[in-house]
């Protein structure tokens, strides 16, 4: 089995995770959550997008001088995309509430919650410098994110929110492909 086939098999093996995630999103929105629950839910997503932006920007800043220029470009685009996603989700929250969001207070409140996710999980399991773990995480986590954002866009009746989330879902697919390309390259390396 070559690296492309191997990486494709990883995606196929994670299809149940992707489907379960879509089912959770659908069940959540079918439950008709209150405005407060929606806002809290989206604040978590907004903060996660900001955390991704910071972590990926740090990754770009610390790339070796001889790093592949295309990889630098792709990761830089991802950092930019995460900043856009942060703004889009902030705008969604303000659209729902009709009020400006106190971003600093929202981030502080979310940071006080004990849930470890994203980059914090990589640090917890001492994988934040492991190229293979990072590529695998990016491939699978961003692939899952693509499916989740698209499912939210499908479930949400408000077109302002749906269009914002469809854009985010599209970008997450690109981010997953960055991980896929890196993983294929690493799996070809001795």
Indicate where each model-derived feature is located.
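Non-heme di-metal
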Residues: 1-190
């Amino acid at each position: 089995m070559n690296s492309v086939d191997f990486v494709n098999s990883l995606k196929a093996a994670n299809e149940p995770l992707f489907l379960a995630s879509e089912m959770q999103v659908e069940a959540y929105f079918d439950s008709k959550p209150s405005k407060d629950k929606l806002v809290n839910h989206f604040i978590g997503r907004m903060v996660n997008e900001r955390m991704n932006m910071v972590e990926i920007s740090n990754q770009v800043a610390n790339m070796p001088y001889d790093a592949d220029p295309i990889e630098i470009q792709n990761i830089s685009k991802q950092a930019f995309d995460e900043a856009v996603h942060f703004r889009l989700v902030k705008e969604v929250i303000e659209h729902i509430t009709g009020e400006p969001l106190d971003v600093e207070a929202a981030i502080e409140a979310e940071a006080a919650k004990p849930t470890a996710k994203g980059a914090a999980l990589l640090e917890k399991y001492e994988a934040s410098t492991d190229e293979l773990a990072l590529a695998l995480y990016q491939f699978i986590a961003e692939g899952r994110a693509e499916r989740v954002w698209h499912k939210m866009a499908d479930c949400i009746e408000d077109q302002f929110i749906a269009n914002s989330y469809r854009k985010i879902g599209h970008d997450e697919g690109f981010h997953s492909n960055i991980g896929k390309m890196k993983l294929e390259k690493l799996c070809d390396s001795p």
